[in-house]
Amino acid sequence: MDELLIQDPEVGRAVTLEIERQTGKLELIASENFVSAAVRQAQGSVLTHKYAEGYPGKRYYGGCEFVDIAENLAIDRAKAIFGCGYANVQPHSGSQANMGVYFACLKPGDTILGMNLSHGGHLTHGSPVNFSGRLYNVVFYGVKKETGYIDYDEVAALAREHKPTLIVAGASAYPRTIDFARFRAIADEVGAKLMVDMAHIAGLVATGLHPTPIGQAHFTTTTTHKTLRGPRGGMILSDEDNAKTLNSQIFPGIQGGPLMHVIAAKAVAFGEALRPTFVDYQQQVVKNAARLAGCLTAAGYDLVSGGTDNHLMLMDLTAKDITGKDAEHALDKAGMTANKNTVPFETRSPFVTSGVRLGTPALTTRGMKEAEMEKVAAWIVDALANVNNETRLAAISREVEVFARQFPLFAW
C-alpha cells in the first residue's frame, strides 16, 4: 500500500477507504468473503506478467514452465476437493464457466430449462438480458408458492413438455438443499444433459455439508470465491471424457490468455480447502446462518421457505411494506452491507424488489459465531424498524463499528 499511495494517491485512497469499509462494517452479502493473506499474495505476484495461452505442457508461449506448476496444482487440488476426473481452472468468472459448458453442449436456439431469476436462479441460467437468454430458447421452473421449495414436479412436467437439451440446476438466492439426484433422473428421462451451477454452495459441497453434484451432473460449474473463499474466478468440473471439448470451449473458444496470478491464487485457496480447518469453517457458516435466520423469524420477519439449510437466507419484506431497496439503504447506513433481492412471485421491479438477501460466509471468516449472530440480528431488526430514522441508523452504525473492529479482516 505504501508504494501505491506514493505512485497513485487517488487509487491508493480508494483502496484505503475500502479497507476501512470492510473493517468497520458487517458484510452480509451472501456472495462475498474474505481471502487469506496467502491468496492475496499469490494474486498480487509476478505471475500477473505472464501470458500462457493454452494448457499446461501445451502452451503457445515460451517460459511457462513455472506457471504450469501453479495451474497443475490448482487442477489437482480441485479434483481432490470434489472427487472428479477433470477440472478447468481457467474461466475468469462463473459466467464464463457457464458459457463454456453451454458452448460445449448447445447450439444457438437449443432449449435450456433453468431456474427463474426471481425465484432464486442466476442471470446466466437464461435471463433474457443475458447471453444465455439471447442465444438459447429458455424455459423456466421455480419454487412452490406455499413452501418456497423447488417444485420438482413442475421441473419434470416442463422437461417432458419442452424436451430441453440442457437442464440447469443451481441458484444464487435459494436457501434450501438441492436434490441433484432428482434433477438427474428428470434429465435422463427426457434425454437432456444436466449442468449444476454450485457457485454459492461449493464450500459446503467440498466439506460434505451439501450433497455433491459430482456423479449426478454431466457438468458442474462454480465460482472460486463465495463459500470456497478463494479469488474471484470460475471453474468447470466434469469427467475426463469431456476434457477435450470443454478445454477447447474455454480456450480458444471464449478466452485468450488465462490469468495466471489468479490461477495461482485459486491453487492456494484450494490447498486451504483441503485442510481440516476448512470443514470447521463451513460448519460454522451453516450454524451461523441457522441462528441468524432463527432470530429474524422470531422477530416476526418472513424468510422465503421459512429458513435456511445453507449459508444464505432471503428476507421477504412484503408484509412489512418495506422495499428491498429501502432496506438495503437502511442497513448500509446502519453499518451492514446486504443486497436487495427479488423474492418468488415478485410484484416490484428488480431495481426496487421486496426482499433482502443475507449470508454468513464473510462474518464467519472474521471469527463470528452464534452469539454474534444474535447481535447482528438485533441490529438488522432495529435498522429495519427505523428505515427513515437517520439518527437511529447512525447510532446503530457506531455500535456496529465498535463491534466489527473486534474481528480483524486479516486474522488468517
Swiss-Prot record:
GO terms for molecular function: glycine hydroxymethyltransferase activity; pyridoxal phosphate binding. Keywords: Amino-acid biosynthesis, Cytoplasm, One-carbon metabolism, Pyridoxal phosphate, Transferase. (6S)-5,6,7,8-tetrahydrofolate binds at L117, G121, H122, L123, S349, P350, F351. It is an enzyme of class 2 (transferase). It is found in: Cytoplasm. It catalyses: (6R)-5,10-methylene-5,6,7,8-tetrahydrofolate + glycine + H2O = (6S)-5,6,7,8-tetrahydrofolate + L-serine. GO terms for biological process: glycine biosynthetic process from serine; tetrahydrofolate interconversion. Pathway: One-carbon metabolism; tetrahydrofolate interconversion; Amino-acid biosynthesis; glycine biosynthesis; glycine from L-serine: step 1/1. One of its GO terms (cellular component) is cytosol. InterPro entries: PyrdxlP-dep_Trfase, PyrdxlP-dep_Trfase_major, PyrdxlP-dep_Trfase_small, Ser_HO-MeTrfase, Ser_HO-MeTrfase-like, Ser_HO-MeTrfase_PLP_BS, SHMT-like_dom. Its cofactor is pyridoxal 5'-phosphate. The record marks H225 as: Plays an important role in substrate specificity. PROSITE patterns: SHMT (PS00096). The keyword Transferase applies. Its EC number is 2.1.2.1. The modification N6-(pyridoxal phosphate)lysine is found at K226. It comes from the Bacteria. Its main location: cytoplasm. It holds the Pfam family SHMT. PANTHER family: SERINE HYDROXYMETHYLTRANSFERASE. Homodimer. Catalyzes the reversible interconversion of serine and glycine with tetrahydrofolate (THF) serving as the one-carbon carrier. This reaction serves as the major source of one-carbon groups required for the biosynthesis of purines, thymidylate, methionine, and other important biomolecules. Also exhibits THF-independent aldolase activity toward beta-hydroxyamino acids, producing glycine and aldehydes, via a retro-aldol mechanism. Belongs to the SHMT family. This is Serine hydroxymethyltransferase.
